[in-house]
Amino acid sequence: MENICTNIAVVTGTDKQVLEQVIKDISKNFECYTDIEIDNGCCELEFSTNGPFPREAMEAMTKKYPGKDLYIQVITYELPNELVQHHIYENGKWTDKLKEKYQQNN
């Protein structure tokens, strides 16, 4: 059985409709812990997942908005198993920042 992970996300964008739709998709697909408010094109929210960062689900959500000014950062953690991940969506693609960082140091 996979453990429950906490995800803290920051979603920003200049197109308010796209921003609202991405946030709606996240809240529809995952259990959100906090009240969701958009302020000046930015929203911070917290949600849970069964297991690590839900890359496939997030890619499916963001694939709908190619070429849009959309920036998403997600920190995923589950402390009992020492899991920490940092993913960024920028310029139409997702990157795993910690994986990149530690591959460069090896």
Question: Predicted segment positions?
Answer:
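Charged interaction segments
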Residues: 21-106
